[in-house]
């Protein structure tokens, strides 16, 4: 049987998660919540001590809206094909809401080198740096991943300062952060930070609980390069803008990956978003939302595969087989056509001509040189800065 975390609390959480896998749209829209809760409790109460799937499986923890999905069939097509051809199966769970809350769930297991409940996870690289520096991740064997070695974009090999050569992290997607607005309410769109302060939006604006995305976008809107040489003064100015907007009631929502629910229901009319999520919402619901990477600059990050120390050697090799599968350009193109984020796989743009010709020149997936000029990375923080800035951010958000 598959292993569960040694920590009893984490083990119970994992058992409940695996016992109640819902359609992703239900999760994001908050549908059937009552039934889900009842089902979760019922299944958890009768779960066996070992729980989970069989021994011939691995568990991949990811974000929502982050893998191609067939609504009618209720499957992830690329993953379904992989499971059919591999001699093991991948249990795919959309458990990452934001980096800090997910890290809090697995922190104890990581520190003890115990199984976390996941054989591979795809957190953001700034968080992966924390795990790398703590010695909590296993080094990849590129002999098992020829596609990665051949097809990872050249710029990505050295993109993470704490992991030159990508020994411990392999990019999954490069998410971009911008903002969105209800097109019916604001047909002219929103293009500056001041636009978000429109009195018509009072109580209807939301921001993301990821500090680097929210503060990065504010810094950029205030004329500061988030990747540049800024410090406490610039951070404090950005925080002052955010605190004023929250205290006045203009911003009324701070969420992680479940923020899309409030956009879909109309509870929120505008806010900071992960670009691809809104592209998918418009695909599902009709073009109800305008979305843009602001002219002054939006944010870009990297979510990367990692393998925690508690994963067995056998399952680490299986994870490497899975990653290598997704580094085939045609598979990467199929995923990118759905998630609408920048793909790190060379050749995916050429492969997209066969997968979905309408997406070949989609700048959300394949940014041009001009597009890259409008994307900003958040600079690497020292541990002391990270702690101090994160504490200040959490305080203002009331988290």
Task: Write out the residue ranges for each language-model feature.
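N-terminal secretory signal peptides
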Residues: 1-22, 35-41
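Conserved C-terminal helix/tail region of periplasmic/extracytoplasmic solute-binding proteins
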Residues: 13, 368-399
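N-terminal twin-arginine translocation
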Residues: 20-29, 37-54
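Early extracytoplasmic/lumenal segment of secretory-pathway proteins
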Residues: 54-125
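A structural signal for short loop-to-beta-strand junctions that line the ligand-binding cleft
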Residues: 114-123, 138-178, 204
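Ligand-binding pocket segment of bilobal, Venus flytrap-like solute-binding proteins
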Residues: 127-129, 206-210, 214, 218, ...
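A bilobed periplasmic-binding-protein/Venus flytrap-type ligand-binding module shared by bacterial periplasmic
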Residues: 178-185, 220-223, 301-316, 334-338
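Mature extracytoplasmic/periplasmic domains
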Residues: 308-373
